[in-house]
Amino acid sequence: MLSSGLPPVVLLLAVLELSSDAGASLSEEEKKIILDGHNKYRSQVSPPAMDMLKMSWDAELEAFAQAYAEKCIWDHNKERGRRGENLFAMAPILDLEFAVEDWNGEEKYYNLSSSTCVPGQMCGHYTQVVWASTHQIGCGAKFCEKIDGIDAEGMHLLVCNYYPPGNMKGRKPYRAGPSCSQCPEGRVCVNSLCAGALDTEELEASSDQASVDQPTAGAPSTCMGLSLFLLPSVILVGFLL
């Protein structure tokens, strides 16, 4: 993995737009915010990715994540098996768009060429978000009166699980090159992501559809980060194993 034994990092936060007051579970709109956020950042990686798959929501991963969120534990699920995982906690509200943005924000600390993270920083959230082969995501959220492992009370806990998991030792999150130039067989390029047939059909049925291009060339893990946010201060606590 990328690092270990990371000390707490304290940052200041000014949030202008706060959305989502998630309770015991996520609404369809909230699920869309999370999924769209992941796909947006995956499509915008720099340098571009040759093989970035478009993510889709998975009900089984959602149920798995929700069940763990209900336990209100500030630690990774030791029984998650072959599932990637990102955790995020925030008070007094839960801003889902900001959560994904924050995970992706670790990009500035990550060097794709050397596959290294700036010492003392975290990159595991980001690399899971943009892990090219990860194509399924499911998340759960819970308002916890008390989260085991956090002193503060009244926190929202977000758990996202991924399949297949990212952050595999010795591997980069994606291959740099012309967008979609190495999409798997049967997938087409939609907004710089390798999308399946269903995604293409949905775009064709939409009045404001984006362009759909064929890949320019044919083609025949687990995040261990924790993010805790308390307004108006941000406390980023994490460890990568």
Question: How would you label these PLM feature ranges?
Answer:
Residues 2-241:
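Mature extracellular or exoplasmic CAP/SCP-family domains and secreted bioactive peptides
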